[in-house]
């Protein structure tokens, strides 16, 4: 993988760890993430004059896949919040971030993108580590342990993450091609921000519509957590914009998804040593294996 992609993903991983740690400490219902994504929309409206010529040339295929990525991101944030409400950051986050590798790698095979043997070995290690972080002792292999509500919510969030990763790689390629065809192409550094902005607007509205089922939660979130939700919005937008930029340097999106797992180790460390979550050998070994 090209070194620019490595640098971009490492910076993104630190930002990702930060916003998930903040979200875990707050009320992470749909209202919280609706506010955070809404802040992203507001902050980057000034980009639209530069992006609009590109947006108007995007084909119908782009918009079809775009609907799928918004749905996938909605599922990701909704179920991630559910997982954080009943589970530990150091357990929910690794599951939500690692399982998408299986889906993305499988889809890559379907489209003729064959990962190298070292890459496949890395995928297997990440999945093994994901099982370990859920265990309290190495001798504990109870199926019930892996079917707790927090773990199930994390799995559903992982499905959303896999879905939008695949869709976003497809759409970023379309945007790059459309951009080169323009008489005055948009700066390549701005294209990922444009795409992320396009996603954030309908995503915020969708999450807000879900949150409307409980108006009291919306008021409580606005009163108690609006500042932290805004910070999460900035970090979320910046972190994923860096990932989208990194995708431009790789041919196989599974490499990007896999390398992002460095954030798993960071988040487990934060969960244990800063949030006071349960510390045990399998969890630490699992995080190291995934790293």
Regions picked out by a protein language model, each given a short descriptive name:
Residues 68-73, 84-130, 197-201, 252-273:
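Specific alpha-helical transmembrane segments that line the substrate/conduction pathway
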Residues 157-169:
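Transmembrane helical elements of multi-pass membrane transporters/channels
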Residues 169-174, 271:
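Short, well-ordered amphipathic alpha-helices
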Residues 18, 22, 79, 106-110, ...:
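Hydrophobic side-chain positions within alpha-helical transmembrane segments
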Residues 8, 236-291:
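C-terminal appended segment following the main domain
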Residues 44, 105-106, 117-137, 282-291:
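Hydrophobic transmembrane alpha-helices of multi-pass small-molecule transport proteins
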Residues 1-68, 77-87, 128, 135-155, ...:
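Membrane-interface interhelical linkers
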């Amino acid at each position: 993988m090209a070194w620019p992609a490595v640098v971009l993903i490492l910076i993104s991983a630190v930002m990702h760890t930060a916003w998930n740690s903040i979200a875990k400490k707050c009320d992470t219902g749909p209202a919280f993430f609706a506010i955070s994504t809404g802040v992203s929309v507001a902050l980057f409206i000034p980009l639209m004059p530069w992006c609009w010529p590109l947006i108007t040339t995007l084909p119908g295929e782009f918009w079809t896949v775009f609907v799928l990525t918004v749905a996938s991101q909605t599922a990701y944030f909704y179920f991630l919040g559910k997982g954080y409400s009943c589970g530990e950051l150091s357990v929910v986050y690794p599951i939500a971030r690692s399982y998408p590798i299986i889906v993305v790698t499988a889809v890559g095979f379907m489209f003729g993108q064959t990962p190298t043997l070292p890459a496949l070995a890395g995928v297997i290690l990440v999945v093994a580590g994901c099982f370990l972080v859920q265990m309290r002792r190495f001798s504990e292999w109870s199926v019930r342990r892996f079917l707790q509500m927090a773990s199930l919510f994390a799995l559903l969030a992982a499905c959303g993450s896999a879905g939008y990763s695949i869709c976003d790689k497809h759409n970023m390629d379309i945007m790059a091609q459309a951009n080169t065809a323009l008489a005055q192409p948009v700066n390549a550094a701005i294209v990922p921000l444009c795409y992320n902005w396009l996603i954030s607007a309908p995503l915020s509205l969708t999450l807000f519509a879900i949150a409307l089922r409980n108006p009291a939660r919306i008021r409580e979130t606005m009163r108690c957590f609006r500042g932290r939700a805004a910070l999460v919005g900035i970090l979320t937008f910046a972190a994923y914009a860096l990932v989208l930029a990194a995708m431009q340097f790789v041919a196989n999106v599974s490499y990007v998804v896999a390398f992002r797992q460095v954030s798993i180790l960071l988040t487990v460390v934060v969960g244990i040593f800063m949030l006071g979550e349960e510390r045990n050998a399998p969890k630490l070994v699992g995080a190291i294996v995934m790293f």
